[in-house]
Amino acid sequence: MYPSLALTANHAQPAYSHDTPNFLHSTGSPPVYVPTSRMPAMLQSLPYLQSCDTAHQGHHLANHPGWAQTAESHAFNASSPHTPTGFSYSHSPPVGNSSARDGGYQSPLIMGGGARDQYGNTLVRTGSYPSPYSYVGADMPPSWAAGHFEGSMLHSLQGRQSLSGRRSSLEFLEEFPGEGRECVNCGAMSTPLWRRDGTGHYLCNACGLYHKMNGMNRPLIKPQKRLSSSRRAGLCCTNCHTSTTTLWRRNSEGEPVCNACGLYMKLHGVPRPLAMKKESIQTRKRKPKNIGKGKTSTGSSTSANNSPSSVTNSDPTPVLKTEPNITSQYSGQAIVPVSQGHSQTDDLVNGSHELKFMPDEYTYSPTALSQQSGLSVPLRQESWCALALA
């Protein structure tokens, strides 16, 4: 990018510096693009190009086929502070050793500071264009004095930095929306949901809902808890003048009455007599619901575990009536005679003996049961068939 590199290309032929608006080339190297404004500063930094005569420069510039010299142009001089408006064409001595080549490579570093100063001073004097080094941050001060436009650019950079700082703070608040907010009504700092009133102020969830439902601000003083119904202050039964009850009622006139007087008036239609007033509140003694179920379950279990003697004395035991001279024809059944007093009484009435058996412990054949009972229909072999025969 630096034009001085092209000056060390050829050793046999002299290298010429052709000051065109955009190109600098020698006889043995391709042209290199160089801005026109940097050419005077570069030529000023090269001492062996300043010894050329001005007449020779003007002669070659006039004979150049591609460009014509203007009337107001003048030759470039090292003492002239302004950049030339025309073009110069000068010879340069041949470069014969490696030291000149090294100097050519070092020339960009040598001309860097001077070119920057010359370029910057020119722009400061004209005041029409900003500095080309304005992209450098504010922490890197330039080597020339800041002009009008450069100062404005620095101020704009500082303004952008301040805006970026504000933007970052706003983004931080948006990232944590609950931070730094306070309810304007109760002063709460944290709430599940932030709301706004009609003026845009922040309200906590409770105050916002209260304002939305009631149309007014939520009261800061919490209301006192209501007393229990049995100890409400200032309440007294208009009938019996008691102040203790489980439930306060109202009569037809809207006056408060105790639970007892209110129920009595509701059921009988007359006021409750004062003679029925008691000092203590009578409560109903309700039986627990599980007691009845427990009794039925225990009764069934005891009846199932009773002995045969107790079974014979119980009333619901099935009874099978047979003739006195007939013996049992079906196997597996034990016939138990009843006591004589009981059997004699039954003989007088029925003229037969009663035999009791255990239906749960024995099985019976259907043919024997049908022959014994005198039934023509065969019985099904089930445990409850003996109950049907009773």
UniProtKB/Swiss-Prot annotation:
Q: Name one GO cellular component term.
A: nucleus
Q: Which keywords, in A-to-Z order, does the entry hold?
A: Activator, DNA-binding, Metal-binding, Nucleus, Repeat, Transcription, Transcription regulation, Zinc, Zinc-finger
- What is a GO molecular function of this protein? transcription cis-regulatory region binding
Family matches, as SUPFAM superfamilies: Glucocorticoid receptor-like (DNA-binding domain)
From which residue to which do the GATA-type zinc fingers run?
183-207, 237-261
Instruction: Extract the Pfam families matched here.
Output: GATA (PF00320), GATA-N (PF05349)
- Region annotation (Disordered) ranges: 76-101, 279-324
- Top-level taxon in the UniProt lineage: Eukaryota
* Compartments (UniProt record): Nucleus
Tell me the protein's name: GATA-binding factor 5-A
Q: Which organism is it from?
A: Xenopus laevis
The encoding gene: gata5-a
